[in-house]
Swiss-Prot record:
Gene3D superfamilies (alphabetical): 3.30.465.10, UDP-N-acetylenolpyruvoylglucosamine reductase, C-terminal domain, Uridine Diphospho-n-acetylenolpyruvylglucosamine Reductase, domain 2
Pathway(s): Cell wall biogenesis; peptidoglycan biosynthesis
Family to which the UniProt record says this protein belongs: Belongs to the MurB family.
Residue positions of the active site: R164, S233 (proton donor), E329
Name of the encoding gene: murB
Biological process per Gene Ontology, one example term: peptidoglycan biosynthetic process
Molecular function via GO: FAD binding; UDP-N-acetylmuramate dehydrogenase activity
Entry protein name: UDP-N-acetylenolpyruvoylglucosamine reductase
Keywords assigned: Cell cycle, Cell division, Cell shape, Cell wall biogenesis/degradation, Cytoplasm, FAD, Flavoprotein, NADP, Oxidoreductase, Peptidoglycan synthesis
Domain FAD-binding PCMH-type span(s) in chain numbering: 17-188
């Protein structure tokens, strides 16, 4: 199995943060997975991180833990009478998969075009955009368990997908890694145009037309990480109960909201940040994107801690204005492995800053 020591991770995270690990492994087969050091609970389970393409990762410290970057590739298609079964290696690029499927006449993922990252990372977060989620087409996940050194097949139901959540962030967290994903795409396809920005398309639009519109929308709102380092949406869209929403709507009648099946209401985190006066806000070499307030950008910092301080500042401002808590979607990695945002208590929010004017300027003052 290929591995490296003292490996730089700067080009392996879309924030372009300077970090390195003592060792990185690149397993590409079951035999190579079985050659990994003992990562089962009670050994080094807190001191490693499974890295995809680094598009949803923030290295908080200069020293990262042991890194495992699976290299399972390949795509296979089995055509049935009324559906396609597509099996994909975890290391395949997500957007490339979307394009490949459409080229093969397999539709369903077009709303998820241009989402950065690998296929293996998609089920962990249950990625979603423009009214579609990964879980909508998942059939099965192949998962390697560290303790037993065996592969397991998990059904869609067993994965317990929820909004930006799955069993891989819960009971099976750090107990194994995803090697392969199997999708089920019905041949009976209808465009999902329910989301704002897509509702201007004709009902007869093709999947390629939908994908083109999604790409145009994302490109107009989200900066290219290669040009302006970022990790896409930094915070999850918060979900509140109907009573709390009623109070918010009374005060802010135009607040964007999305009713959920369970009766709760999903809010737009980007709108909340914008209304808090932080769109385009910049502090030193980190800031909030000028077109999409949900995206935090790195203008040249090499320190993940500076992104954390900015995020905590945003969190405080939104909580003060709306009494709504923003929870990061991006994963926080220290030398001990992944940590929750709230546990990073030694990193303080930006202090003595007041947003003035058009929110692109800042000045020092006492922050009330």
């Amino acid at each position: 199995m290929h591995s490296n020591q003292n490996y730089s991770l700067k080009s392996s995270n879309s924030f372009n943060i300077k970090a390195s690990c003592s060792r990185i492994y690149f397993p590409s087969s079951l035999a190579e997975l079985q050659q990994l050091p003992d990562l089962s609970a009670g050994n080094t389970s807190d001191n490693f991180y499974i890295l995809g393409e680094g598009s949803n990762t923030l290295f908080v410290e200069a020293q990262a833990p042991i890194i495992i970057q699976p290299k399972f590739n390949g795509i296979s298609i089995v055509e049935q009478d009324d559906h396609f079964v597509v099996t994909v290696g975890a290391a395949e690029n997500w957007h490339d998969l979307v394009c490949f499927c459409l080229e093969q006449g397999i539709y369903g993922l077009e709303n998820l075009a241009l989402i950065p990252g690998s296929v293996g990372a998609a089920p962990v977060q249950n990625i979603g955009a423009y009214g579609v989620e990964f879980a909508d087409f998942c059939q099965e996940i192949q998962w390697y368990e560290f303790a037993s050194e065996t592969l397991h097949s998990l059904t869609k139901q067993a994965c317990r997908f929820a909004y930006r959540d799955s069993i891989f962030k819960q009971e099976r967290y750090n107990k194994g890694l995803i090697t392969q994903v199997t999708f089920n795409f019905p041949k009976a396809w209808q465009a999902n145009l329910s989301y704002a920005g897509l509702d201007t398309l004709a009902k007869e639009s093709t999947a390629k037309q939908v994908m083109a519109q999604v790409i145009a929308l994302r490109s107009s709102k989200l900066p290219d990480p290669k040009e302006l380092p970022n990790a896409g949406s930094f915070f999850k869209n918060p979900i509140v109960n109907d009573a709390d929403f009623a109070q918010l709507q009374q005060q802010y009648p135009k607040i964007p909201h999305f009713p959920q099946k369970n009766g709760e209401i999903k809010l737009a985190a980007g709108w909340l940040i914008d209304q808090a006066g932080l769109k385009g806000f910049r502090h030193g070499d980190v800031g909030v994107h000028q077109q999409q307030a949900l995206v935090l950008v790195n203008y040249g910092s090499e320190l993940g801690a500076e992104i954390i301080s900015l995020a905590k500042y945003i969190q405080q401002k939104v909580a003060k204005k709306f009494s709504v808590s923003l929870i990061p979607e991006v994963r926080m990695i220290t030398h001990k492995g992944e940590r929750s945002f709230s546990s990073l208590s030694d990193l303080n929010p930006i202090e003595n800053i007041t947003v003035i004017g058009d929110s692109n300027s800042i000045r020092g003052s006492s922050d009330d």
